[in-house]
């Protein structure tokens, strides 16, 4: 019997004897207690384990003690140890020469410590979950130093960087790059003080040379761009508009006296500035979070795999925890304890106390190991000749090629109100033989309509979409793919071959909603660079000629799951419970299956800086949708698990590295190295944004068996390193008469708060409440 089980039984025995002393029936209560027998594996420590483990204080599992261990791969650890992991203060030496001395928590570097590389580089400061995170000092092998704030191995916050060549930067950092306000001083004494963007001088700032000359004004990509003033040490100055393009340069010289205009060309400033380079600094060869611990698995138990439902319900709840402790006897009463209501209340109270103190959780069966879902096939059916929608696809591609190809580039993102007029549309006729403006084609004649073309052209520029790439994705030689089944609304979805864009057929009502809210949408996505709402790139209509005169409306959107990482799990989250579970058996669920609220078995933990930005942005996006009377939207979430064994089992964060006689050390496995490489490579940081390729931790949750519609399960303390992609989709449903009737009808049958069709204000509040429970700060 384990120590925890003994504690529970003793506590129960004390309570029962106290309440039943007058009746003297305490012994009968425990007459029916039976505890599952302990296996040989649980009770025995093998000789091999004793050979590999040397400890200065051999304590039982569950106690903190000092240990010195030479691990199977040659690594060495000395320090405090708890339940098969370094825990407390300790020193770990890797065989490649790396070393860590400092605080540990459950096998992860956590707290203060010092990490050393074989090159001589060191980091001394705060760690969190294996990452350099907090305040710390990094010293590179060539003498570079950075002292300041870190987030997940990246310089983030205020910090001072001293380069080996003598240059110094003192200012703000974001995701490893100079950002916002900062001062950069070169070794000759010249310095720039002002705004930065992505490690380049950009925005408003001042450059001062050692000879006393200075430039005050606006910058772009390291050079003056826009209005600015160049001042000489003698007091004369030049005011004007600056640019690398001589045709855009213009200004006026103001002498300090009557000297007149000097023999000076403003282009000399650009020539001079080109000599002042921004140092990129050194690149860390291997990050602390990439270092694995070769921790010996002392238990060597092989649990029988248990079937786990997609929502994580596996024998949970207090009743199931005590299935083998038959306190109340059999149903027939044979051997049952005669316990009155007073005793029951006392026992219930004791149970609640034990629950609060954590004893009950220790007896609950651990959930079955999680596995990578079965890989799904590439989504969609290729639309080739003979497909029922082949001509419709040709019409769409012809129209896009015509519409995008003829448009002039956008000069300004400031649009007139008339550009958003729903009547601002252009019809173009496409006969098979072609016209002066349209090419000949092999499809039947059709008409093409562009809605608010200038607005969507500006949106594409705002979202940094290259027109040529846009046309190539949709209209290239590769055909579109039609998803296997239409959506709940009856719309069809099409994917481009490169997965970058999704095309959806729309009802007339949805088109009206988008046109009505287009101005507000444009202003919102322009004001908030990190908005999570879906990106719209175009709105079009194909009108087929003939007796039917059928109209098909399309909206072109960004595909949220277009990523370099494979998506293992997908969730569509609304915050409601009615009908919010998958209708597929678990055997049919694969990586393409979109799961729902009641299928969710994780809480997602974001780093502090990202979490705060996430909270702000969700609030802003929901306020926008609420103002536009939009409801029934979802947060679409994709998860890429960074670590799994060769057998497909997910490896929790901080878990033991698979080694020993039961596993193949040379077997390939999915690693977090790719993501750590992304974090350490400055050229790839731009791909990380709010909702896009975000490193995070997913904590597994379990739902209680006595709670039918528990939206958010209870945390288990089991974490997984993940990359997350998420965004808000389905934002074209307003609270119209049909939704009001749906709400009234379903409210009679179900709990009104459990259904999706509710007033936009209530929907927004419920959505945020749910999302802020599912996403939390990683502290």
Curated annotation (Swiss-Prot):
A single GO BP: stomatal movement
Catalyzed chemical reaction(s): a 1,2-diacyl-sn-glycero-3-phospho-(1D-myo-inositol 4-phosphate) + ATP = a 1,2-diacyl-sn-glycero-3-phospho-(1D-myo-inositol-4,5-bisphosphate) + ADP + H(+)
Source domain of life: Eukaryota
Annotated spans, Activation loop: 735-756
Residue ranges, annotated region (Disordered): 20-61
Coiled-coil spans in chain: none
Residues in MORN repeats: 77-99, 100-122, 123-145, 146-168, 169-191, 192-214, 215-237, 238-259
Name this polypeptide is given: Phosphatidylinositol 4-phosphate 5-kinase 4
Keywords for the protein's UniProt record, in alphabetical order: ATP-binding, Kinase, Nucleotide-binding, Repeat, Transferase
SUPFAM superfamilies referenced in this protein's UniProt entry, alphabetically: Histone H3 K4-specific methyltransferase SET7/9 N-terminal domain, SAICAR synthase-like
Gene Ontology MF terms in the entry: 1-phosphatidylinositol-4-phosphate 5-kinase activity; ATP binding
Record's keyword annotation contains ATP-binding: yes
EC number per UniProt: 2.7.1.68
SMART domains tied to this protein: MORN, PIPKc
A GO CC term attached to the entry: cytosol
Residue intervals of the PIPK domain: 382-775
